[in-house]
Amino acid sequence: MVARPMDIIFDSNSHVTLTTLDLGYSHIGRHGAKYLVDALQNNQTLTTLCLRYNELEAVGTEYIADLLRNNTTLITLDIGDNRIKSQGAKYLADALRTNKTLMVLDVKRNSLEDEGVQHLTDALKINMTLTLLDLRSNRIGIRGAQYVADTLRNNTTLNTLYLAFNQIQDSGARHLAAALQDNKTLTRLDLGHNEIRDQGAQYLGDA
């Protein structure tokens, strides 16, 4: 049998100390994602995985989510720029409900929109380990901001949240500001480039 390239590169017997794997901008696609996950199933050392800009889409993201369900070492996952959309977000959210180790999740520039954000924020009402979530450039509107706000009211682990380059506007800022009055753990919130004007700034300032 001819070995697949991913199996050769990630043979767990020869890479027992691998902790960081950066495959960003490698165009591995959905099929490459499956090979990668198969090769990493038994890995017990990897803590950081970067898959940015790899054309994974929702199908490839489902394979990554399967890895998250069983993995007990991965701390950081960068899956930005992969067009995973709301369905891909749902796969990740389902995995986050059971994963106990992931602390950093980067899903920027994935066209998640409000529906995708709802999937992730619902999972964060259960997940108690994630500390950083990057949602920049995901076409998140006022409704999506409300989903985020609802989660922030009760979440006690998230300390960093990136929401820049969306369409949250003043009304979305009002939802977030109200949630910040209850939240005791968030220390960094990036809301740049969100069409937030004077009124939105006042809401946030009052919080």
Predicted regions and their residues:
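Leucine-rich tandem repeat or coiled-coil scaffolds
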Residues: 1-207
